[in-house]
């Protein structure tokens, strides 16, 4: 796969917990530790009547690039409803007494807050797991939600870029 990637290319590899530690070592060997970008945790809610042990509610996706000039589009999530974001983003300055005050225009009006982009997405993604009766289901046993694939593709490519799905969409 490394051979066919452009110098700005990325690779995202999903793995279950049983072999993720082996895959990480292999990927470090192939792409180099310096091209490791992130270990994305895909978390979801599932219920089970398992009586012993911890219920697995996440999977791992390794994100590597071919070089340091990789393509990456930042995504933003909405601010928490309890965050007073207008106040946080408001421009401020110090008055003659050294006290921090909101900036005002020539007319004495408070200058509006900066653009609200949101919070950059972290490496923990909460995306619902496909339930067995979901309309999106294709019958493939390890199918991933389209929302998960969509986020990865939009994060690592632009419109018109070539994206390789080595499983030809059978899992999505």
Q: What is each PLM-predicted segment?
A:
Residues 1-172:
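Core catalytic lobe of class I
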């Amino acid at each position: 796969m490394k051979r066919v990637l452009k110098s700005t290319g990325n690779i995202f590899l999903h793995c279950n917990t049983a072999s993720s530690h082996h895959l990480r070592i292999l990927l470090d060997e192939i792409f180099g530790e310096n091209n490791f970008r992130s270990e994305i945790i895909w978390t979801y809610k599932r219920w089970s009547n398992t009586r012993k042990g911890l219920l697995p509610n996440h999977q791992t996706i390794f994100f590597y690039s071919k070089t340091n000039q990789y393509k990456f589009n930042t995504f933003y999530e909405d601010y928490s409803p309890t965050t007073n974001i207008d106040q946080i983003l408001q421009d401020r300055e110090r008055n003659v007494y050294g006290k921090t005050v909101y900036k005002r225009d020539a007319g004495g009006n408070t200058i509006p807050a900066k653009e609200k982009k949101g919070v950059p997405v972290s490496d923990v993604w909460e995306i619902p797991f496909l339930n067995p009766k979901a309309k999106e289901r294709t019958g493939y046993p390890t199918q991933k939600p389209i929302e998960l694939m969509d986020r990865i593709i939009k994060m690592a490519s632009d419109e018109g870029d070539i994206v390789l799905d080595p499983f030809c969409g059978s899992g999505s």
